[in-house]
């Protein structure tokens, strides 16, 4: 056998071996793919879709929800019965093709199975999502329906439990309860017949009506309590109180109280009748108006009761206050009469006392008859309270005026005593000032000082004459004492000023000697100042002349002399 043939045989054997190995590899790879597809199919088949379907079935779906559920359930049935069987057959066929090394058809079958599984996965995902949505929606709807029913049943129970609190509104409340119940029945009918949209609208209305009625039933008891209990009780209290006050001799400025009672009673009845319609805003507004009418009646009675208490106190105070005022006036009249012997008084005091008598008489005339006949009088106590208050205020003013007059009279004798003491003091001061001036040994007394001195002396003599009269005019004494005080103080200041100017002028004239020989202006001023000092007795002018001249040659010299003088100035001894 030639080597060529051998090589050909070897090559053929190698090709066969390689082909076989490749076939084995492809087969194993396909086996692996088929196994994975089998696992995917089994995983899909093992999903709890049946359990989820059973859970949704237990919800007892109705209407459109039930139709939708049936569609998705049928889709699952088709998928589980047909699609999975078809996939199983294709897998079996792919295994046979692979085992018989029909790799091309096996590969095609594997691709086909994978596509079927992808579609099955998508369908199962859609089915499960749809079931979840149906379950969630149904649970929400069930919870909503359950909540609405529970709310209605709770409202119904609370109304039945407190039916006595709703009074005349009970028939209308029961009517609205029946209407709500009818709406729930209509909801069930529509929902069962497959009309979920309209059923939902009916449920919305039933919920709204339940909530609205619940809110009403929360307000109604308070409104009914006022109309059936509070207002009638208050009105009975007012009417019985009114009768009792009339028996106790109370009178009222308001003449329509009985009519106002009737108005309140009618308003209560009208609001009770209108409450049947359950217009609670209007009922509450009417209740507020009724309460205001009742409160206004209470205010009237309380005003008169309060006035009566005040009057009882005032009718005890006023007679004693009148006696006190009259006694004060008598004392004032006696004091004025006593003082008139010695003093000429201001007519104002006597006029005031006469005015006091008139005010007292006016109060006696206006108030005492009422107090004396208090148990039979026919005026409202509030009117009498105002009259009594005015009387007490009038007596308060009288007493204040009496105190003013009393203090004024009490001060009259002190005024005279003080005036005499001041007069004696001023006369002594006048003599002391005169001695003070004489001791200065001045060339002469300035005319302005003499004018002030004689004016002061004349004022003191006039005050003395007034005090020596048989009847002293006390106001004149007051004015003259004030004038004398000012005159003496002015005289004292004038004396100090004259002596200071004279003393300082003498000192400056002596001091100017050091400048006269070489300062012509100082010599000239010296001559003028000396003439003013010794001849004219114009000490102020002389001081001004010499001080001005010295300041031109020695600034500050005048202040130095003035400061030294003020430290050693002699005072007038009184």
Curated annotation (Swiss-Prot):
Cytoplasmic side: 27-574
Keywords: Cell cycle, Cell division, Cell membrane, Coiled coil, Membrane, Septation, Transmembrane, Transmembrane helix
Keyword Cell inner membrane part of the UniProt annotation: no
Topology in the lipid bilayer: Single-pass membrane protein
Subcellular localization: Cell membrane
Coiled coil regions in record: 102-141, 255-368, 409-495
Disulphide linkage map: none
InterPro entries, sorted: EzrA
Superkingdom classification of source: Bacteria
Cell division among keywords: yes
Topological domain ranges for the Extracellular compartment: 1-7
Location (main, coarse): membrane
Protein family (similarity comment): Belongs to the EzrA family.
NCBIfam families xref list: PRK04778.1-1 (NF003407), PRK04778.1-4 (NF003410)
Role, per record: Negative regulator of FtsZ ring formation; modulates the frequency and position of FtsZ ring formation. Inhibits FtsZ ring formation at polar sites. Interacts either with FtsZ or with one of its binding partners to promote depolymerization.
Name assigned to this protein: Septation ring formation regulator EzrA
UniProt organism field: Streptococcus mutans serotype c (strain ATCC 700610 / UA159)
Gene from which the chain derives: ezrA
